[in-house]
Amino acid sequence: MTAAFDGPPLLVANAPDAPDWRPDLRTIPDVRPGLGSLGGIYTAVVEAPAPVVCVAWDMPFVPEPLLRRLGAGLREHDAFLPQSGGRRGVEPLCAAYGPACRDAIAQSLEEGDLRAIAFHARIGVGILPLSEVGRFGDPELLFFNVNTADDLEHTDEMWRRLESSPSSGGRTPERPR
């Protein structure tokens, strides 16, 4: 993400040892703990000095050019999300959020609606169509979440395939440390 935005990312994490994960990053806990993913998005919007592009920690295959494209979408929208084949149809944990999202998210949190897309009706949301997302890679791979030991093992296999694939053209995302 540093390469995508000319500055270090902000790590929003609640684990007591989170600052040890990446000591080179500013790490902050949720400003309103216990509110799930929406609470994390809210924290990023509140704490960052500018609009933010959020990427879930467990999405290792999101490439820099996609992050840049999402950030560019904020020129015309309050939030900009990639379309996906997931259950929501969009990926709110790999998306760009502008300052207008702050109050809209706060209202959803106050109402107890913790869905990551709960505040979308209150702001101008843009969607990066799946056809354009596909230009950055296979959406299923791009938005793959690592939630279990099996997922982690599968991730290692996918990294090896990506790194050895001639079709990647050297465009594989930076491999996590």
Predicted regions and their residues:
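Nucleotide and nucleotide-moiety/phosphate-recognizing core
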Residues: 1-113, 117, 121-142, 153, ...
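Conserved anion/nucleotide-ligand pocket segment
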Residues: 144-146
